[in-house]
Structure formats: C-alpha cells, structure tokens
Amino acid sequence: MGWRQLDIDKVHLALIVAGGFITFFCYFSEVFRKKLLVGEAVLGSITGLIFGPHAAKLVDPFSWGDHGDYLTVEICRIVLDVRVFASAIELPGAYFQHNFRSIIVMLLPVMAYGWLVTAGFAYALFPQINFLGSLLIAGCITSTDPVLSALIVGEGPLAKKTPERIRSLLIAESGCNDGMAVPFFYFAIKLLTVKPSRNAGRDWVLLVVLYECAFGIFFGCVIGYLLSFILKHAQKYRLIDAISYYSLPLAIPLLCSGIGTIIGVDDLLMSFFAGILFNWNDLFSKNISACSVPAFIDQTFSLLFFTYYGTIIPWNNFNWSVEGLPVWRLIVFSILTLVCRRLPVVFSVKPLVPDIKTWKEALFVGHFGPIGVCAVYMAFLAKLLLSPDEIEKSIYESTTVFSTLNEIIWPIISFVILSSIIVHGFSIHVLVIWGKLKSLYLNRKVTKSDSDLELQVIGVDKSQEDYV
C-alpha cells in the first residue's frame, strides 16, 4: 500500500496548472502585453488546450462530477459580476448622465440588429434547428466581452492612442450589454418552454423585462448609492483602512451576485449599475490607481476563466457530421457573425452616436465587439434550462428541438468564441503592422519631397536626377 499523501488528485492537478500558468504570465507580463501584444484570453485558452482533456489530459472539469454544466454557469456568473462591476467603476463619474444617448443607441439598436442577423445565419446554416432555436443561439452571442479588447480599453500600448471617449464607450457598452443580453436570450427560452405562446409573451414582458432587468437595474442603483453613502462617511470618520478599501471591488459584485440570484433578478445588470452609482462622483476611483488591486482581481479572474475555457472546448464535435455540424458550416457561421453582427449597424447609427466622430472610429467600434465569457455563461445556462428536469414532460416529449439544442448549442457557441479570440486577440497586431507600414510610406514620401527640393535649390533638372 503506497503513501496516501502521494496519490494524484484531479483537482490538485488543476491547481498546479492554474497556479503555474498565472505565475508564468505574471513574470513575463510585460513581454506578453507590450511586446508580443497577446492578452489573457489568448494565452489562457492555449494553456487550457495544452493541459486539457484533448492534449496532455491533466485537467478535465467534466470528470469532476455530474454537475459540470452548473459549475460552468456559476464560474461564469462570478467572473462576469466582478468584471462588469470593474468596468463600471473604471468609467468617469456620472458617465451615463452625459453619454446616455450614445449608450442607448449602442445597446438597443445595435444589439437587436446583431441578434436578428445572427439568428438568420444560424437558421440558414444549421437545418436541424427551428427559428426559435436560432434565436436562442443568437441570444447567447449578442453581448460583447471586455477582456478580448483589453489591449484597447486597458493598459496596452494601443490604449494610449485610443480617444478617451471611444475607450469609455467600449467599456460602458461591454459592461452593460452582458446584462442587457438577458431579454434576447430569454425571448427564445420562454417561447420554447412556455405554452401557449401568449403566456410566454406575458412571462417575458413581466418576469424578464420588467422584473429581472428593470428591477435589477433599480435594485443595483439602490445598493450602489447606499454603499457609496456609507463609504463616504466611513472615510470621513476614518472607519475604513486601505486593505479593506481595496477589497470592495471584489466584495460588492459577489454581494450583488448572491442577492440577485436569490431574488431572481439580472445580477449582471445589478452589479454593473451598483458600480455606476457606487462611483457616481468618482468617490472610489479618485483614491485608487488604475493598476491597483481591482486590476489585479480582474486579471486573475480572466486568466483562470480562459484557462478553464480552453479545457472545455469540444474539439471532437467540430466536425460532427452525424449531427449536421460539419466544420465548414461552423467556419462560415463564425465569419458571417464576426463580420455582419456589428459593423453594418454601427455604420448605420454612427450619426446618432455623439461619441463616434468619424467613419474610421465607427469601423473601430464596430469591429471591437468580441464574444467571450457571457456567451459561455448563456450557452450552459441554456443547456440547464432545456434539460428534461426543467421543462414539463408533455412539452419536452412533443418535439426533438430540446435534445437537439442541448447537443449542438455548445459546439456552435464555443467555435464562435474561439474564432473571436483568434480574430480580436490578434487584431492588435494587424493595427500595429498597418501603422508601421503607413509610417514607413509617409517617411519615404517626405524624404523624396526633401530630395526634390534640394535638386531645385542647386538648379538641377528633375529629369537629370539620375546623373547627379
């Protein structure tokens, strides 16, 4: 009988991989971020792929028990709540008051257009699902992810060249639309699982739009205002120390996540608007540096999550011809989604968005709408909500759409996320190369102009330049 302490445990292997990767990234973060221009999402996904069940086979989250889908949903929930709160407190004070029109246009028309267009692509390319199933798939990838555009809105070299109004617009949009994707997601869920359809429409308006979203926003604002009021007096009477002050960006979103889940409201919107009201007068952000504990928390969560994502990518299903998922359909769907989901509508609404001044900025904003954590969250939440345990037996057995969606929704969504990581993760390299080529061209043009001027000064005809 061997020494029990030396038995290898799967969870401990996962801790070694996660801890080792984060340590490695921290030691060489300057190289990765500012020289190689590679962010947490790309490196984390690669690490998860290497050590996951399809390569080294050291980490397989779905072998830890029978609740893999639920575990993934809760991991995503915590990461999203912390991230959207961090986005909210990063914005200038009273940002929504001064930029309300830009935010509303970027949330409602842009998200609605992307949802419907993506649903059309899914319906055309995946014949085994009906249009409601296509709307559900589109609802999962309606929101944008701030991590994949961290080099633009964070501390990357391109962030300094991005106008502050564009940077703030992207932060506000990516932080808010994670929660705003909930009505689009539940629209299909309600129509699929609630019969008759008029009851589904009633539940969607009353329970999802008004209670989950509207009341979630209101409750988040109340919590944010109260906590800001308490913080103000805690500082005034010196009741709070520095360590506790830096713990708030983690504690408050966890509080919102727990309360929101228990009372059944949209905890993502609740966390975001709690952050907005918490920092409405810059009370919090003016006393905390950009590269302090909140940034550290966000980085750690991002590294852990995308490493986890790399281990759950269903590579075996990316050429699943039996289920009508040949890889060419996934590639075409991903390309169409990334190209047409935002760019056309952002160009269309550009005159209505005061923060977007030029067509070049419209192209920039339209392109940087990456798909990430929220898509994983909603894909696995859809699997839970469409399981036999959550749907009336008569409704579940009346159609095969539930079992079909349960089988194909994650392969489709994960392939789109992977495509987004590749495209948006390396877009920065294209921009840098383009900038260098443009600079080289302009320098050569200036040099040639100076040379022509010198020839004119010494009286040499330009046609005789070769003989000088």
Swiss-Prot record:
Keywords: Antiport, Cell membrane, Glycoprotein, Ion transport, Membrane, Phosphoprotein, Sodium, Sodium transport, Transmembrane, Transmembrane helix, Transport. One of its GO terms (molecular function) is sodium:proton antiporter activity. It is found in: Cell membrane. The chain crosses the membrane at residues 12-32, 36-56, 81-96, 103-123, 133-153, 169-189, 204-224, 258-278, 293-313, 320-340, 362-382, 408-428. Pfam families: Na_H_Exchanger. Glycans are attached at residues 287, 319. The modification Phosphoserine is found at residues 449, 451. One of its GO terms (cellular component) is perinuclear endoplasmic reticulum membrane. GO terms for biological process: intracellular pH reduction; intracellular potassium ion homeostasis; intracellular sodium ion homeostasis; proton export across plasma membrane; proton transmembrane transport; regulation of membrane potential; sodium ion export across plasma membrane; sodium ion transmembrane transport. It is a multi-pass membrane protein. InterPro entries: Cation/H_exchanger_TM, Na+/H+_antiporter_fungi. Signal peptide: none annotated. Belongs to the fungal Na(+)/H(+) exchanger family. Sodium export from cell, takes up external protons in exchange for internal sodium ions. Involved in regulation of pH. This is Na(+)/H(+) antiporter. It comes from Schizosaccharomyces pombe (strain 972 / ATCC 24843) (Fission yeast). The lineage of its organism: Eukaryota, Fungi, Dikarya, Ascomycota, Taphrinomycotina.
